[in-house]
């Protein structure tokens, strides 16, 4: 591996002590008898602002939190609600009343015509406390059924890297591919691109970020990759 692609930090294994300046962030970093310890495999890296070191988990499952905007996949249809895959161990619920924004009338409203299995939605997590299914809403600007574009799935742990500091990586992706990109907290990304070639380039670039998220020089490699692909495809 070249120095350009070396990990920008040190691998930490579960149970390993961490420096005192690392913030405890359960369940990934715990304070056990006065010593900070990792509970998952992660990376110990220098903070960009020179403020010491931080622990970054390398693998993560998505645990919903109220206020998160997620991209969900309709998994099944109930009597008065839909069950939604949100890329998490927890299956979410969206009520038909919420989707319609009014009371449901079974004599008039056909749930299958509103949302069917396999449809994607952009929704907000309203409530979740691990004792019941996450509750979703599509009432809000930009929320609802996704009717066009492509969905890409990455590790939820890599979401901050796709967005970048001050949205730098996301802006780079949008400027270089001419795609409109929305990154949901649960590791799903919605792309709306001018054509199939630019969409394919954007998907490949995002996959590179997902695979090489914590390597140095990534932004420059992404720019070079996109520019080269556009040259080859003449787009």
Swiss-Prot record:
Keyword hit for rRNA-binding: no
Superkingdom of the organism of origin: Archaea
InterPro entries attached to this UniProt entry: Exosome_RNA_bind1/RRP40/RRP4 (IPR026699), KH_dom (IPR004087), KH_dom_type_1 (IPR004088), KH_dom_type_1_sf (IPR036612), NA-bd_OB-fold (IPR012340), Rrp4 (IPR023474), RRP4_S1 (IPR048565), S1_domain (IPR003029)
Stored Gene3D superfamilies: K Homology domain, type 1, Nucleic acid-binding proteins
SUPFAM superfamilies noted in UniProt: Eukaryotic type KH-domain (KH-domain type I), Nucleic acid-binding proteins
A cellular component term, taken from the record's GO annotations: cytoplasm
UniProt GO MF annotations: poly(A) binding
Subcellular localization: Cytoplasm
UniProt domain S1 motif: residue ranges: 67-139
Keywords annotated in UniProt: Cytoplasm, Exosome, RNA-binding
A Gene Ontology BP annotation from the UniProt entry: U4 snRNA 3'-end processing
Keyword Transmembrane helix: no
Residue ranges constituting the KH domain according to the UniProt record: 149-205
Function: Non-catalytic component of the exosome, which is a complex involved in RNA degradation. Increases the RNA binding and the efficiency of RNA degradation. Confers strong poly(A) specificity to the exosome.
PANTHER family hit by this protein: EXOSOME COMPLEX COMPONENT RRP4, PNAS-3 RELATED
Annotated family: Belongs to the RRP4 family.
Oligomer and partners: Component of the archaeal exosome complex. Forms a trimer of Rrp4 and/or Csl4 subunits. The trimer associates with a hexameric ring-like arrangement composed of 3 Rrp41-Rrp42 heterodimers.
Record's protein name: Exosome complex component Rrp4
Species whose genome carries this gene: Aeropyrum pernix (strain ATCC 700893 / DSM 11879 / JCM 9820 / NBRC 100138 / K1)
């Amino acid at each position: 591996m070249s120095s350009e692609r070396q990990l920008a930090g040190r691998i930490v294994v579960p149970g390993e002590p961490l420096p005192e300046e690392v913030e405890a962030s359960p369940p990934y970093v715990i304070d056990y008898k006065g010593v900070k310890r990792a509970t998952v495999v992660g990376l110990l890296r220098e903070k960009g602002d020179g403020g010491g070191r931080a622990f970054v988990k390398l693998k993560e499952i998505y645990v919903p939190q109220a206020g998160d905007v997620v991209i969900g996949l309709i998994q099944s249809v109930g009597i008065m609600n839909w069950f939604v895959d949100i890329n998490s161990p927890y299956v979410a619920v969206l009520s038909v009343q919420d989707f319609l924004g009014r009371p449901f009338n079974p004599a008039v409203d056909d749930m299958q015509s509103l949302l069917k299995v396999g449809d994607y939605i952009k929704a907000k997590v309203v409530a979740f406390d691990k004792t019941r299914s996450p509750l979703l809403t599509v009432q809000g600007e930009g929320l609802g059924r996704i009717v066009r574009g492509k969905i890409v799935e990455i590790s939820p742990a890599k979401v901050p890297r796709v967005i970048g500091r001050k949205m730098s990586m996301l802006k780079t992706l949008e400027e270089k591919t001419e795609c409109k990109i929305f990154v949901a907290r649960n590791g799903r990304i919605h792309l709306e691109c001018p054509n199939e070639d630019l969409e394919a380039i954007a998907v490949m670039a995002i996959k590179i970020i997902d695979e090489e998220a914590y390597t140095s020089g990534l932004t420059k490699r992404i720019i070079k990759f996109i520019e080269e692909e556009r040259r080859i495809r003449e787009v």
